[in-house]
Curated annotation (Swiss-Prot):
The gene is rplW. One of the early assembly proteins it binds 23S rRNA. One of the proteins that surrounds the polypeptide exit tunnel on the outside of the ribosome. Forms the main docking site for trigger factor binding to the ribosome. Keywords: Ribonucleoprotein, Ribosomal protein, RNA-binding, rRNA-binding. Signal peptide: none annotated. One of its GO terms (biological process) is translation. GO terms for molecular function: rRNA binding; structural constituent of ribosome. It comes from the Bacteria. It comes from Baumannia cicadellinicola subsp. Homalodisca coagulata. One of its GO terms (cellular component) is ribosome. Pfam families: Ribosomal_L23 (PF00276). Belongs to the universal ribosomal protein uL23 family. This is Large ribosomal subunit protein uL23. The lineage of its organism: Bacteria, Pseudomonadati, Pseudomonadota, Gammaproteobacteria, Candidatus Palibaumannia. Part of the 50S ribosomal subunit. Contacts protein L29, and trigger factor when it is bound to the ribosome. InterPro entries: Nucleotide-bd_a/b_plait_sf (IPR012677), Ribosomal_uL23-like (IPR013025), Ribosomal_uL23/eL15/eS24_sf (IPR012678).
Length: 100
């Protein structure tokens, strides 16, 4: 039970941008925001159990948070981890069912 809860916390959200949309259409790759402490093995296990697709390889990147200003005040966004997940041929993955 504890292991299942950990798997649910590994994947945070899909990362949607122009670059990721192009990569997803051109190649069989998913781009997800994941927990900063998650390992490649944990990400692979979570994808396998939650979405039931086979993972070929995973590349991870830690994205540095930006400095933001609001008037004189300076704030910082936190760092986060992005995972590029390559699926085997024939494996299809849709985050939103019924999307047109």
């Amino acid at each position: 039970m504890i292991y299942d809860n950990r798997l649910l916390k590994v994947i945070c959200a899909p990362h949607v941008s122009e670059k990721t949309s192009a990569v997803m259409e051109k190649n069989n790759i998913l781009v997800l925001k994941v927990d900063k402490k998650a390992t490649k093995a944990a990400i692979k296990q979570a994808i396998l159990q939650l979405f039931e697709v086979k993972v070929k390889e995973i590349h991870t990147i830690i994205v540095k948070g930006k400095t933001k200003r609001h008037g004189k005040r300076i704030g910082f966004r936190s760092n986060w981890k992005k995972a590029y997940i390559t699926l085997y041929e024939g494996q299809n993955f849709t985050l939103i069912n019924g999307a047109k």
